[in-house]
Amino acid sequence: MGRDTIANIITSIRNADMDKKGTVRIASTNITENIVKILLREGFIENVRKHQENQRFFLVSTLRHRRTSKGVYRTILKRISRPGLRIYSNYQRIPKILGGIGIVILSTSQGIMTDREARLKKIGGEILCYIW
């Protein structure tokens, strides 16, 4: 049985966010680095640094905790395409999350990107996760 690194990232970030931890440590792979770069660019995490421990690399991400008048705002991450059920979409049918407020992360032939970038380039791909 293989590992689902994308689900591991999402679960680690979600658990750290719910537990109000400041940082989360994720094993570094090409996919995880690209997803974390997107989260950093979109403002869901504050910063990222690469850390080496016993010849293994990890990404240490600082989470962004936003406060509203009703309490702490939680970032919701949801895995869509998984190893047992892959979900693909062309660029015209990529869903808009909360009317465009949230983002969809896709794996395309040109790399991992957000739904907005994929629509601009007019390419579809595998829908990895939703974030809002």
UniProtKB/Swiss-Prot annotation:
Protein name (record): Small ribosomal subunit protein uS8c
Subcellular location: Plastid, Chloroplast
Function: One of the primary rRNA binding proteins, it binds directly to 16S rRNA central domain where it helps coordinate assembly of the platform of the 30S subunit.
Family in the record: Belongs to the universal ribosomal protein uS8 family.
UniProt main location, coarse: plastid
Gene3D superfamilies the UniProt entry points to: 3.30.1370.30, 3.30.1490.10
GO CC terms in record: chloroplast; ribonucleoprotein complex; ribosome
Single GO MF annotation: rRNA binding
